[in-house]
Each structure stands twice: as C-alpha cells, then as structure tokens.
Amino acid sequence: MGVEIPVGRKATVKVPASTANLGPGFDTLGLALGLYDYVTAEVIESGLEVEVTGEGEGEVPLDERHLVVRALRATLKEADVTVPGLRVSCTNSIPQSRGLGSSAAAATAGVAAGNGLAGFTLDDQAQVQIASTFEGHPDNAGASVLGAGVVSWTNTPIDGVSAPAYHARRIDVHPDIKATAFIPDFHASTEAIRRVLPSDISHVDARFNVSRTAVMTVALRDDPDLLWEGTRDRMHQTYRAEVLPVTAEWVNRLRNLGYPAFLSGAGPTILVLSTEPVDNALVEEARGRGMKVLELGIAGPVEVDVTG
C-alpha cells in the first residue's frame, strides 16, 4: 500500500471542453475549446462526498460511479498513493452528450486532480493514457490534457489481452483561429451515432480523408485559409446525417456559404473554425430555432492548483 495523502489537501481543476475529428480526422484530431468545467477534490477523513452543479446536475451519479471519481481513483492507484476519504465538487458548464467532450473533460479532471493530490508524479502522456481509457479513444482527452490542437493515435496490442496504448501530441493553433459552436437542444449518444457507420469504406474515400487530415494539421498551425478544404470528410459525417438531420442541414448550409463547418465529435453540435465571425443573421436564426450559439477561443491545457 502506498503513501496516504494527508487530510486537507485540495486540488482545484479547470478543464476545457473539446471537439474531435475536425471533419476528416476521425478518432485522430482534437481541439481544446474555451468552455470549462471546474472540479475540486479534497482529502477528508473518511467516505466519499460528491456534489454537482450546472450541467448534469440531478442526472449523474453522486457515488463511486461518477466519472470524475473513477478517473481520480485510477490515477491515485497509478501513482501508488491512497486517501482516507474524498470530497469532490463539480461545477459544470460543458453541455453533456452534445459532442463537446464532456465525458473526456470529466475523466481529464479526475486524472488531473488525482495527479495534483499525489504530487504531480505523472507526466502528460501518462495522464492522456488514463483519461483515454475511459473514452476508448484519445482525441478528446488528449485535447483536454494538452490544450490547443492534438494529433492522437491508439496502439492496440496484437495479443488481444493487454490494454491499448493511447497517445497524443500537441499542435499549436494559429492565433487568428476561433470557434463558433451551434449547440442543438437535444442530446446524442456517441455509441448510438457510431452504430450507423459502415464497417468498411472505399479506398478512394480513405485516400480523400488521409489527404484532408494532413491539410487540416497545416491549416490549424500555419494557414487558416485552408480550413474549409481541411474540414472536408467522406468517412463519417454523411452516414451520421441519417440520424442527425438538423445537424446535417446546418453543416451543409454553413459550408455552402463558405464557413468551415463540421460535426463536432459525434454531434449534435456543429462547429465552425474560422478567422472571421459567423454572420449575425445566421446566429440569430439558429438561436430562434432553439440552438445555443457560443463563440469560443482555443483553450490551453487543463490547469491544477493544489493547497494543503
């Protein structure tokens, strides 16, 4: 059994939302967004206390099943430390089940809090590994851990037994690029949306997406003029349009007007990456149809402050 962390030590975490895929980079590209959840984890004498306000309040479990708690416990175990008890408080602004990385943010917050309580013994890639384990892919978690843009990948062991190895590397984002999120007033299940995807795609479509993913990395870092071309996709958005017709309508409409729009993660949120704001008339129309429209900057990495 490892060292026990003293009662009273507290980790306060600010974790960003994220968007994944960015059009062609399915389960590969991610981007941290300036919308945040805040988590405080304090060591107490015994037991577990969980409090949630904001997004998810009254909907998520307030016990060991809570994702922040699960990720925090996993991190403490990896760091070989223990706690007599925990008080976890979450103040959430990231909409849940909307394609903005709420679950990855929760996992990242738990990992960051655990790492802070343990004395910052784990490096960034170790934190990406633990957080991604709860996701099954590292694009969102990588973005929340590292900030800015990320290229991510997964190495799946051939023995079929060992755990996958998740990796992410940061891409600095051109300072002129901003995000506009069009957030519909309904949820989407990532698992359900993934089920509509075919098991195979054509070589032509695969080649198309490989090239546009490469273009997108250049667009993000150096050349925002390439954002429209870099967000083109033939791998997943067409299939998901069948179950997200409102989202598909807005993606197509925005793109036809020249905006680099795409499905954010599994949706239903639509994201535009550009150097210019979206026309106010479109924004007001979207709001009139029940959408929340947020102008977001590109975020830095998860932040942790430890006291006690």
From Swiss-Prot:
MF terms in GO = ATP binding; homoserine kinase activity
From the Swiss-Prot or TrEMBL record, state where the protein is found: Cytoplasm
Q: Which GO terms describe its biological process?
A: threonine biosynthetic process
Q: What PROSITE patterns does this protein's entry cite?
A: GHMP_KINASES_ATP
Name the reaction it catalyses.
L-homoserine + ATP = O-phospho-L-homoserine + ADP + H(+)
InterPro entries, per the entry: GHMP_kinase_C_dom, GHMP_kinase_C_sf, GHMP_kinase_N_dom, GHMP_knse_ATP-bd_CS, Homoserine_kinase, Ribosomal_Su5_D2-typ_SF, Ribsml_uS5_D2-typ_fold_subgr
Q: Which UniProt keywords apply?
A: Amino-acid biosynthesis, ATP-binding, Cytoplasm, Kinase, Nucleotide-binding, Threonine biosynthesis, Transferase
What Gene3D superfamilies does the database record attribute to this sequence? 3.30.230.10, GHMP kinase, C-terminal domain
What are its E.C. numbers? 2.7.1.39
Enumerate the residues binding ATP: P95, Q96, S97, R98, G99, L100, G101, S102, S103, A104, A105
Q: What cellular component terms from Gene Ontology apply here?
A: cytoplasm
Question: Pathway it acts in?
Answer: Amino-acid biosynthesis; L-threonine biosynthesis; L-threonine from L-aspartate: step 4/5
Q: Which family does it belong to?
A: Belongs to the GHMP kinase family. Homoserine kinase subfamily.
Against HAMAP family, the record matches this protein to: Homoser_kinase
Q: Function, please?
A: Catalyzes the ATP-dependent phosphorylation of L-homoserine to L-homoserine phosphate.
Task: Please state what the protein is called.
Answer: Homoserine kinase
Species name for this entry? Corynebacterium jeikeium (strain K411)
